Every structure is written in structure tokens, then in C-alpha cells.
């Protein structure tokens, strides 16, 4: 019998879509959009629809596996859990619990995925990952400037006179914002896209401005310099609601507009156009993630924040420096789920440098890695070093629903349930403010189990099973307990399917910022407290002609690795045959200079690694620019991260994935 159920998308994405899922005789057969969702309105992308394929795939992991003599063999849950618990017990008795590394990412936005922290805190505390390969630099940057990274509600864009989409290809990664762009353009708003690549979002724009990769912060600084010279800054905001603007003005005096133009590879006309735009608010600015994946990435976001603030576009309807929206995640009582007070010790490795830190760790060395919600061998920079790190560690465990590149490398693989096989609530701290309920629709395939069951069973074996003596409903109610006064309850979520969270739709409208000064900080005291310079700086990408001329001569092209169109990072690649090859997008000047055409096979290389792929000439892109979509599996040509840089960004919390020079030649 066929039945349609409300559900939600778990993927790490801006849009967090509402679903209608069809179940026939205990099997998920179709995933559609929920037309009653107030933001996503029934429209979903192929990545969401593919969750049906992933759930029913014959390649699903269905049984616990152990590697013996280089081959995986099926074992029982009892054996798997006993042996993993034995190793955890041995480490606790003979070493320190920080000899265990919990390597995790954000493959699933379910609230109960946080129960892994409950387990590791109950164990005593382990080595945890801090920072983010995705958006860490920008989140940290906005915490320095505003106190938090808060975004405007999706519908506030209808109050904007102008919209600037800066480094975010919303047609690929934020489809419901793209819909709103179409609508506000019809109502008379202008749309400007700033990006090194002329993408489908740029086709919608009234104006497209190409900027040299990694120099977006310099562009924002140049526009701010023009604004100051025009006398068009918002002096009331600057004098009453900010600190440190004099530092900005003094720095900008040291760089001429001619130097800004040369380094950003833009024009004076473009600078004047943008300055006039920002002075003619309200202007909403939507920032993407790629431009903060450089050594100077945090500074890039800070300069755009500074431009938005100084032009008077903070705290007003139709304005905003929209990057993340972490007020969504802050709404939940996560510490009731994670119990951080149980930790007796801790150690942290950077998300970006975790491989190097595993290889060099001492007192204690890493003896065990447990991977959840991630695929570090594909997604973490410098793939070859990640492989070395995993191969060095005595025991490695992956908890996943498919045999990823990382799982292939591990000693144990534990099969986990997929989104429609377990109950949870879902949200995203990136865009809209609705939380959604996803009930269990079908039974897990084979012997797959929910993550919470796995943690519960391990906890029982290690003597703290009482931490997991709660039902799924009780855990969900814990997470929602902070919202009871707002009538956001599990009962109402089950009834409605989705509910709005009580967050601001226009952040900072009271000009009460969460910085130490209570004001917008052009010079950040929080940065200084953390040991960084608080003043804005004009730094350049580490792998660039401006910083390392010799390296740029050896490897003349900038490599970007943007999000794929049809896969959420690496998750969908094995299910879509058309994705299963490496496509090398090159700017027209590279094609002309090397006599390359679509379909030509090339080798891309630098000192970290190399890979092969087939050329696709971009119609319009900044000179000397190459893109290879991230997420590709080794079986289909390997991850672009064989080439990428594994250093930390300027504020220590983000990746430098795009700070990457390469060479290219015909294969």
C-alpha cells in the first residue's frame, strides 16, 4: 500500500528542504518537495531526490565488516562492538583517552547526530576536530566583527533595493535564494554577481564583475576606499555603533586605487559602480564559501563586513552581510544532549591539519580513529597525507551507510541507518529559520543501525550505558527543551512537520552587537584576546604571484574546487554514472594558450600530487583559473584534494583549499 509522509532533507546545505516521501510496502519509492513548506515550497534538487536511490542502493552497507588480511569480512554486531570497546578500554587503562581521535564532519544535519559527543564526553574526552574545511574562516571572521554570524531571513530580500551575490553560485548551492532573486529582479531590484567564474547565477544578474581568485577582500577594501573618498559612508553608524574605523581609513591611505585595480584585476569603473551601489541602500549582500578558503580568507569576509557596515547596510531591512545564520543552531539545548561537563580531558586537532597532527602526535600518540558523518580521505585537504595518517594508526573505525574511500581504508566499518530509517529533527544554520521533523518511515536495511544505538551499545560495554537510557523521543525533547516557551515542541513538530524558530529576521536592528564592546568592531578586541591582530589587514593568498613569485612561475594556474551540481560533496557520486569522471574546467585563456578543446585529457599537478581529467572550456572565467568539483572518489579518478593545501586560514578556523597553484599539461 502506498502512503506519502512529510519528512525533511538531512543534507549539509543552505536550503534544508521539506520533503514528501512515498513509501510502498515498506520501501521508499519517491522523494518529492513539500509544497506546504513556507520557504522551499515544494521545490527540491536532485541531491534530495537521490536519497531514495541511496536508501535502496544494492551497494548499501548492511552488515558490520572487519578487515582481515587486507579484505573485508562480515562479522556480527556483537563481535564488532566487543572488539572496538576492548580497544577503547585498553586505551583508557594504559594511555589517555585523547589517544582516540574523533574525526567528524557534517554529512547529516539531524539534531541527534550530536549524540556522538555524548558518548565521547562520557568516555572521558577525546581528541576532537575544531574548525571547518567548509565555512570556518567566515564564521570566525563574523564573530570578530558582529559577535556572531547571523543572516537575514530569506524573505527580507524583498526589502532590498540592490542585491550583491558575492562568490555564491546560488543556482547550484542555494536554489531557493535563486528563486527569490528572480522575483526581486521582476520587482525592480538590481542584482550584481561578483565571482571569478561566470556561472548560471551571473546570467541572471544586471551586472557581473570578475575578480582575481583570492582577492575579494582587496576588492571590498577598494570599494570602501572609493566610498570614503566620495564622502558616502554612513557616519552615524560609524560614530555611534562601531569602533576602529579610523584604523581602516589609515590602512586604506597606504594603498592607491591603482594598486587595488592591478591586484584585483578589476577596473576603476567597476569600483565606482560598486561604491555607488552600496551608498544607495538598502543593499543585501550574500557571501559564498569559496572566497574564504584561502590563507587570507577570514580577512576577506571581514573586509566585506566592513564595506556593508560602513555603507549603512547593517541592522536595516533589506540589508545584511549574509554568510551564515548560526542563531538557528543556537536555538537548541545541545549541551543537554552532549554533556560537555563529563569530559575530564580534551585535545583538539584542526580540521585542516588533522592528518599532519595524527602523524606527529605525542603524549599521547593517536591509537584509534573513529569517523562519523564524514569522508576525510576524499574531503580533507592533502589526500596523500590523510592516507598516511590513517595507515599509521593501529585501529580505525568508520560509521557509514556506504563504503566510502575512508571506510575502505579502515579496520572496521559499522553500517548506519539512513535518513528515512530513523527519527530525527533537521535544521541548517545557513539560511532559513525552520526546524523540521523526520519520522522513521522504513526499517533499516540488513543489520544497519542508528548512530544512537551504536553509541548506546558501546557505552554499555564501557560502563556508562546509563547516559543512553533514553528513548529517541526523550532525546529529541531534550534538544528542544530550550524552545518550550516559544511553543516549539516535539508534539507540535510532529503535527505540523515544520515550525519557525524564534530568531531575528533582521539581525542587529537594535545595534546591540555581541562583541566585547557591544558595537560593530572594525578593529576586533575578540581577535586580540585570541592572540591575533584585531585590525583589518590587506593580506594576499599564500600561493599567489603576490606572495610567492617563484611558485607562481612553476605552477601558473589557480585551482578552485567548487561544490558539485548533483552531489552533496562526495555523498552522491557512486550513484550517478555521469558524475564518475574528473572534469577539468579551464578558463578560455588556458585553452587558447595550450591549444586545448573540450574532451582533451590533461594532467593537473603540483608538489602535493597529481590527477588526470578531461577538459571543459568555461565560456567566461577569470584568467588562469581552473576548477575541479570537489567530492570525486578514488575509483573514478580521485579527489581534487590530492592537490590542495592543508594549512589553516589566517584566523585559524578555516581551510585554504582554494589557495592552490597548479600546472596543467596534455596527458
From Swiss-Prot:
Return one GO MF term.
Answer: iron-sulfur cluster binding
Q: What is the similarity comment for this entry?
A: Belongs to the prokaryotic molybdopterin-containing oxidoreductase family.
EC number(s) reported in the record = 1.-.-.-
Which top EC class is named for this enzyme in its record?
oxidoreductase
Q: What is the lineage of its organism?
A: Bacteria, Bacillati, Bacillota, Bacilli, Bacillales
Where, by residue number, does [4Fe-4S] cluster bind?
A: 9, 13, 17, 45
Annotated protein name in UniProt: Probable oxidoreductase YyaE
Q: Which UniProt keywords apply?
A: Iron, Iron-sulfur, Metal-binding, Molybdenum, Oxidoreductase
Q: Which Pfam families match?
A: Molybdop_Fe4S4, Molybdopterin, Molydop_binding
Q: Which cofactor(s) are needed, names only?
A: Mo-bis(molybdopterin guanine dinucleotide)
All residue ranges annotated as the 4Fe-4S Mo/W bis-MGD-type domain in the record: 2-59
Alphabetized PROSITE patterns for the sequence: 4FE4S_MOW_BIS_MGD (PS51669)
Instruction: Copy out the cofactor comment.
Output: Binds 1 molybdenum-bis(molybdopterin guanine dinucleotide) (Mo-bis-MGD) cofactor per subunit.
